[in-house]
Amino acid sequence: MPPRRRSQSWASNGHGQLDKIVDQKDFFGVSKNSKKVIVLFTRDGNKYGQIMKEHMTVLAQQHMEARFVWVDAEKAPFITEKLNIWMLPTIVCIVDNQVKDQHNGLNEIDGSGKYTTGMLEYLLHVDGMLDEAPSYDREIQEEEEELADIED
């Protein structure tokens, strides 16, 4: 499929934004209709989940190749139990309707909770969920330029 038609197809399937999944029917529909789905499990009061949603909103707009959704784990006990979600936030990476990776908490990004959109993007790129990681590449380049300025 040509890139333009593929982007239109992705957009019609909800790609390009972070959507809330409210029930298991929606969850399984999203998983079935998109090749790559990145699911954030959190709850409304979780501050780290809120930060993650902000980063994922940015990434969803930049990466049409994956569908980004979030689930309130407290309101979706069936899905949460089925996927063995035991820590919030948790990111579940689904490819071809199968769980490929699961990241419990923030330790794989940055245990302090202070991470950039680029760091999350890089993790998802390494997982094979995103085709490239331009935000991460830009952040690394900016750091290298800052270090070069300090050394001069």
Residue ranges and their predicted role:
Residues F68, F78, L88-E108:
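A short, hydrophobic beta-strand/beta-hairpin element that forms part of a small beta-sheet core
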Residues L18-D23, F41-G45, K53, T57-F78:
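Thiol-based oxidoreductase modules, predominantly thioredoxin-like and allied folds used
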Residues K35, A60-R67, M87, N107, ...:
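Eukaryotic basic, amphipathic alpha-helical target segments in cytosolic regions
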